[in-house]
């Protein structure tokens, strides 16, 4: 997918998910999901640091989570772009440690490295893994991307996602809402006009968007959601059910132990997935803890009915955003033409039943809920690169944007569900006589009081000429771009003085922090490349050892152990040296011995080939197959006589021991070719 305008390389589409992430690209005008290095089309959004400080991302990180809970980080998307004070108690209940720094931001503690990470840094590591795998697949470096976010992400969370992309070394060309991306994937080839409801229940977030799709136009009419509701919350219901039952029986709260909590979390996720296809599932956790009486185990059964009863509160929370989106779009459920389910959590039968009940329509099952968002992001990337034509995407802002006025009241400039990009302005004045400056406090949310909304930032306009209160005219303009990122301009219409700011959000990173994290990421990437190179070097060395041993073994079977004896001894010595260098992790010695063994093995194989060619010439000259046949016939006669003589002996008697075995150096193919002699 090359941009025709600037000759740039591929632009990829990335679904940066709470639980799993996916990367896709347009090839030949069609979106293709790129498998990772492990061969999977989805990559767990998990980062871990092993015992030697090595960084693990994806499935490798997830596998060791139970044994390394404090240094394994998942569901970080729930923390990105948020202040510590905004986090719920549930979101903070993870096996690793999250804390508040001096400025109120979220920090993730890594005991293994004795340092702390911002959520953006952890997300950047997942992005870098996706991009490196995509670069290997495409055969060229990937530098540009479209990244999706939940539709209900506020400005801070969007900016933080963009920062994560920058830390990963990406030029983030566009931030696009996940439901909108899903609608792009679903409606790309559909010409008839339809009203689509996208129900997006991911691992940690929930969005509902309503779009009108037809003739290449994708117009978002309304969006709603809950950024603290997702499939992980259903897992936690099972965790609590298991933990409370164990607490009642044994008096031990497993949630207080990090390793036990991780085991409960893994078992809960597994049970949730199984209950999508089964009516009940067994949960077995041996040695989950121990007391003075000995080890303790969990052995229980959870039915789908029990799980649904546990989930009633969460199902009720899913209802409100659907109702709100329908209300904002001025539509009834009967006016929805299609329902598209997005996110792995929508596989739960009770969620699908809820959608059927609320909309009165069967959800579409012809899209992959795990991949459809990344596919839509790849289509948006194709639009930006000029590879996809005649597509117009009209998205909306999910939350109202405004400023704080006298008394702490919010004055909305851009209402929620306004089509973006958009520019709106309003006139304000001073609240005191001879006021020389005003502070602009930008907020986002639906509450009447600014203190109850999300603070996005503050800046001051100074140099206002002295005048009675209410006389100066201060024009405040909001410019919201297609990425959902906001620029605010304040202008004194009398003096012409102007002050502008790109809202970074109160809980996102400063430019200095981003640059430092980018340097750290590049440094870590270099270390990762070095570790990978060492691993590949050892793998190549072991392959060479295996090849050398195989060649020696085959040569001995064909020509005997005396064949090229001096070269054989040299190869065996080099094999031992290389094995020792691998054990000692001596990179220089590995390189030297590898080269020497490779050269010695090449000479040995060349000599072996010459010997094989000589053997083939001998067989052609002396008609060896006929000779062998004659020898075998003669032996058959001798054996026949021996068998007739032995018929009179006891059949249980010990066999004669006088038969001579083949000499150690005799060629295997010089023995008679019949089954009778196989035991010798």
UniProtKB/Swiss-Prot annotation:
Induction data: By stress conditions e.g. heat shock.
InterPro entries in the record: ATPase_NBD, Chaperone_DnaK, Heat_shock_70_CS, HSP70_C_sf, HSP70_peptide-bd_sf, Hsp_70_fam
Keywords of the record: ATP-binding, Chaperone, Nucleotide-binding, Phosphoprotein, Stress response
Intrachain disulfide bonds: none
Molecular functions per Gene Ontology: ATP binding; ATP-dependent protein folding chaperone; unfolded protein binding
Phosphothreonine: modified positions: 205
Top-level taxonomic group: Bacteria
Region Disordered: start-end pairs: 640-680
SUPFAM superfamilies: Actin-like ATPase domain, Heat shock protein 70kD (HSP70), C-terminal subdomain, Heat shock protein 70kD (HSP70), peptide-binding domain
Known function: Acts as a chaperone.
HAMAP family: DnaK (MF_00332)
Family as reported in the entry's similarity comment: Belongs to the heat shock protein 70 family.
Protein name: Chaperone protein dnaK3
């Amino acid at each position: 997918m090359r941009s025709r305008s600037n000759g740039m390389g591929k632009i990829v589409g990335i679904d940066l998910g709470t639980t799993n992430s996916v990367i896709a690209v347009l090839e030949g005008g069609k979106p293709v999901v790129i498998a990772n290095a492990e061969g999977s089309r989805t990559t767990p959004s998990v980062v871990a640091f092993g015992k030697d400080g090595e960084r693990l991302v994806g499935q490798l990180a997830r596998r060791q989570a139970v044994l390394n809970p404090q240094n394994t980080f998942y569901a970080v998307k729930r923390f990105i772009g948020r202040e510590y004070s905004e986090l719920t108690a549930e979101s903070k209940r993870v096996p690793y440690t999250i804390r508040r720094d001096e400025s109120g931001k979220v920090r993730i503690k890594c005991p293994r490295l004795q340092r702390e990470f911002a959520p953006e840094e952890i997300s950047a590591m997942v992005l870098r893994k996706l991009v490196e795998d995509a670069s290997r697949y495409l055969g060229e470096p990937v530098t540009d991307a479209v990244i999706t976010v939940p539709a209900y992400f506020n400005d801070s969370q969007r900016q933080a996602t963009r920062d994560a992309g920058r830390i990963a070394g990406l030029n983030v060309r566009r931030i696009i809402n996940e439901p909108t991306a899903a609608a792009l994937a679903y409606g790309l080839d559909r010409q008839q006009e339809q009203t689509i409801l996208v129900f997006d229940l991911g691992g940690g977030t929930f969005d509902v968007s309503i779009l009108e799709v037809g003739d290449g136009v994708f117009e978002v009419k309304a969006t709603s959601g809950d950024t603290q509701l997702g499939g992980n919350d259903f897992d936690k219901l099972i965790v609590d059910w298991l933990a409370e039952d164990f607490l009642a029986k044994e008096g031990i709260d497993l949630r207080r132990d990090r390793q036990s909590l991780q085991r409960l979390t893994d078992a809960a996720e597994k049970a949730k997935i199984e209950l999508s296809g089964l009516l009940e599932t067994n949960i077995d956790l041996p040695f989950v803890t121990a007391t003075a009486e000995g080890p303790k185990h969990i052995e229980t059964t959870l039915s789908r009915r029990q799980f649904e009863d546990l989930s009633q509160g969460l199902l009720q929370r899913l209802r409100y955003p659907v109702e709100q989106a329908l209300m904002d779009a001025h539509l009834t459920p009967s006016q929805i033409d299609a329902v598209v389910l997005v996110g792995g959590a929508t596989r739960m039968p009770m969620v699908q039943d809820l959608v059927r009940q609320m909309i009165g329509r069967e959800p579409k099952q012809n899209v992959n809920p795990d991949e459809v968002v990344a596919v839509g992001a790849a289509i948006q990337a194709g639009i930006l690169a000029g590879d996809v034509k005649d597509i117009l995407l009209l998205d909306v802002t999910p939350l109202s944007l405004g400023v704080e006025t006298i008394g702490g009241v919010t004055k909305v400039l851009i209402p929620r569900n306004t089509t973006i990009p958009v520019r709106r302005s309003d006139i304000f004045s001073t609240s005191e006589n001879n006021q020389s400056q005003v502070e602009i406090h930008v907020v986002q949310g639906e509450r009447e009081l600014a203190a109850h909304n999300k603070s996005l930032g503050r800046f001051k306009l100074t140099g206002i000429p002295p005048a009675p209160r209410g006389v100066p005219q201060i024009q405040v303009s909001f410019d919201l771009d297609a990425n959902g990122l906001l620029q605010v301009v304040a202008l004194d219409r009398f003096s012409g003085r102007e002050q502008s700011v790109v809202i970074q959000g109160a809980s996102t990173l400063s430019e200095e922090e981003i640059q430092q994290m980018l340097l750290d990421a590049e440094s870590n990437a270099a270390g990762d490349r070095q570790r990978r190179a060492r691993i590949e070097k050892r793998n190549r060395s072991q392959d060479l050892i295996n090849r050398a041993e195989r060649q020696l073994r085959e040569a001995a079977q064909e020509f005997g152990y005396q064949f090229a004896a001096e070269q054989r001894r040299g190869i065996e010595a080099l094999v031992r040296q290389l094995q020792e260098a691998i054990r000692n992790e001596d990179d220089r010695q590995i390189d030297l011995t590898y080269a020497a063994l490779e050269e010695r093995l090449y000479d040995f194989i060349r000599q072996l080939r010459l010997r094989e060619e000589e053997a083939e010439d001998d067989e052609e000259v002396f008609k060896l197959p006929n000779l062998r046949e004659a020898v075998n016939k003669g032996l058959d006669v001798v054996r026949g006589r021996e068998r007739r003589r032995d018929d009179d002996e006891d059949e249980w008697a010990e066999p004669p021991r006088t038969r001579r075995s083949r000499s150690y150096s005799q060629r295997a193919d010089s023995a008679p070719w019949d089954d009778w002699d196989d035991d010798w």
